[in-house]
Regions:
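Phosphate-handling active-site elements
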Residues: 7-12, 43-46, 96-100
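A generic local structural motif
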Residues: 10, 63, 120-123
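Short, glycine/charged-enriched secondary-structure capping and boundary segments
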Residues: 13-14, 37-39, 90-91, 150-151
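Residue-level recognition of short, solvent-exposed, well-ordered loop/turn junctions
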Residues: 17-18, 64, 127
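Polyanion-binding loop/helix "lid" in catalytic or ligand-binding cores
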Residues: 47-89
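Short, compositionally biased
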Residues: 32-50
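Glycine-/charge-enriched secondary-structure boundary and capping motifs
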Residues: 1-5, 71-72, 76-193
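Glycine-rich anion-binding loops of enzyme active sites
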Residues: 1-36, 162
Length: 193
């Protein structure tokens, strides 16, 4: 997807600040769940499998949402490498910030929960890529505006956590730290760290 942005209005990865809310659009982990299940177009798929495969084969980039977010969000990224990896890119670009994420706040895919179980669906939501939903940050005083945008657009926009000082992403589940096995896709050319 390509296009033009008015001068000075590009929404970039940098710009998040400590104390801001972290949001995601839609549900996460469906494309990764389709891969885990080995779904492809040659199979006769159930309704739930079809939902997952559609998200893998025909993702819908949130271009219109991104345009509107230029006036609300301070930083944004599409979730192509996995939530933890892509949020990490935003935090690094914004000055080595951190994040506190609540696992229970993540809108999990009902189809992935049903076919893989809730823990696997959570793992895919945190680390699976190719969803092309948006992850963005916004100051707490813009919560009402984000909620209004969600209602008017018909999209699910969920606050999943907060930007914190210091590096790293902490995910808590039931008040205790949740350990993710991996952080998401790492491009072969990326440096460690």
């Amino acid at each position: 997807v390509g296009g033009w942005v008015p001068s000075g209005q590009a929404l970039t990865r940098q710009g998040a600040s400590t104390g801001e809310d972290i949001y995601i659009s839609g549900t996460l982990g469906e494309a990764a769940a389709a891969l885990t299940l080995g779904l492809d177009c040659q199979q006769q798929l159930t309704l739930l499998e079809g939902e997952l495969f559609h998200r893998l084969a025909r993702p819908e980039p949130r271009v219109d949402l991104g345009i509107v977010l230029r006036t609300l969000a301070t930083a944004a990224i599409d979730i192509s490498d996995g939530l933890l990896a892509d949020l990490g890119h935003v935090l690094a670009a914004s000055g080595q910030l951190g994040a506190s994420i609540t696992a229970e706040a993540l809108p999990l895919s009902p189809a992935a929960c049903k076919l893989l179980g809730k823990e696997a669906a959570l793992s895919h939501a945190l680390t699976g890529g190719d969803d092309f939903e948006l992850c963005f940050t916004a100051p707490p005083e813009r919560r009402l505006a984000v909620a209004t945008l969600a209602r008017s657009s018909g999209l699910t926009l969920t606050c999943i956590g907060t930007v914190t000082p210091g590096g790293g992403v902490t995910v808590s589940q039931g008040g205790a730290p949740h350990v993710a096995v991996e952080s998401g896709y790492r491009h072969h050319w990326q440096a460690d760290g």
